[in-house]
Each structure stands twice: as C-alpha cells, then as structure tokens.
C-alpha cells in the first residue's frame, strides 16, 4: 500500500511532523513518503493519504487546502486523514479552561469533512525557531511590534509520542499489524 503524507509548512515544523508520520508508517511496513502538497501532481498513484498543514489564525495554509480541493474526489474514495500544527506553548488549556488542541482546529476542516469524509483529524502543537526570519506580511508586522515579540512562544512544542501514536493508529487502520519496527 502506497501512502502519501502531503504537507504545507511555512517554517518546517509541519514538514517535520509529516516526515515523522511517513517514517513511522514505514516502520510498520507500509510504503509511505512525505512530500510538499504544492509539488504533488500524481496523487492518483497513492492508495491512502495523510494531509497536513500549519495553521495560522485558525486557517490551514493554502497549499494544504488547495491540495485537498484539487484532489477531493480521489480523497473522498480513498482512506484519508487530516492534521494541523500550530498551537504554541506549554499550556494545554486556554484561559477559559478549554482544550487548546480542540479550539485550534482550522476552520477549513468543517468544509473538508463534508467533502472528503476523512477517517480522522488531529491537531498537534507546533514549533517556532527564535532565529527564524518572519515570513509573510502578518509575521513581519507582529515581529516589529514591541508586544508582538513576546506574544508568540518560541521553541519546539511538538509532542512526538502523540504524533507517533497517531501514526500507529493510521497504520493499524490500514491493516498493519504489530508495533513499529524502528
């Protein structure tokens, strides 16, 4: 079984998650590869899909959304999972006591859920390299504001055991048996 882990990443955090998922699926004996969503022109050759994108201001990166929209008929008929990365920091609940991962689901997921019926969706914490240069207008503006510099937590907040566990669930859903071999 051939699995594509397509991703849209601005600073590399989501790419790292996608590569880890593909590696973990491979450790279960599945043929999986991670590729930037914008570069995929041959989606029909894959049997299953995991599509991920970074989320900013409750929106998935456009390359992830565009990949799903362009391939929606194919994704609707084959096993598909969606993920997002983006929440930053160590807090798992917000000031109102709500689960951060549940309240940061990209707005696009509701529409995509109706169109392609993914088997599951997941939100993972992301990462921000303090040395990374801002990308895009909004990031540049926030980085120039005195309060903006401290408003965004810096560091790697990705939960690798949670990412591995989700990849293991996907592998088992696709018929892989036993634990990951790597």
Name each model feature, range by range.
Residues 3, 53, 152:
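Generic anion/oxyanion-binding catalytic loop in active/binding sites
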Residues 16, 24, 28, 33, ...:
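FMN-binding flavodoxin-like domain, especially the glycine-rich phosphate-binding loop
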Residues 34-44:
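Short acidic low-complexity segments
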